[in-house]
Amino acid sequence: MRHITNTLRCLSFGLLMGLSTVSAAQENAGDIKIVVEQPWARASIGTSRPGGAYLALRNEGDVPVYLVGLRADISAMASIHETQTNDEGVSRMVPAGDIEIPAGGTLALEPGSYHIMLMKLQSPLVEGETFPMTLLFSDGLEMEVVVPVLRIGARSPEG
């Protein structure tokens, strides 16, 4: 009986540890190891306005990697943008080129900075639902991420 109890404790701990990392996706290719953390998107009002998606990319590899693009079937035109603010405080979003994720570093795609624009939505982003998105990297790596949709006014993965 004692052996069964200890086995159940170990299994329970393992399950809890697995659940704590469920929001992180990992992909390895040689010396490259990318971890995706806390992907999320805001709910949209229909399909007439673009949607936004956010996440963090951690490079646990030994060499820099570049995020070069993405695909998302929910959007006819998905791209990475950067919010830039001029000296007068006026902000605008501009397409970003390839974005470096330094070896051992993290790239945050978040409101007011780099972010994913989902233009020409094929269906609305509905709170509580998810959608798949594929990230494209300079080394040819493609990584699919499942993105949960949060409330329309969300400012972070916590809502």
Regions found by a protein language model. Give the residues of each.
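Sec/Tat signal peptide C-region and signal peptidase I cleavage site
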Residues: 21-25
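Bacterial N-terminal signal peptides
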Residues: 9-20
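Compact, glycine-rich, soluble single-domain proteins
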Residues: 26-159
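Positively charged n-region of N-terminal signal peptides that target proteins for export
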Residues: 1-9
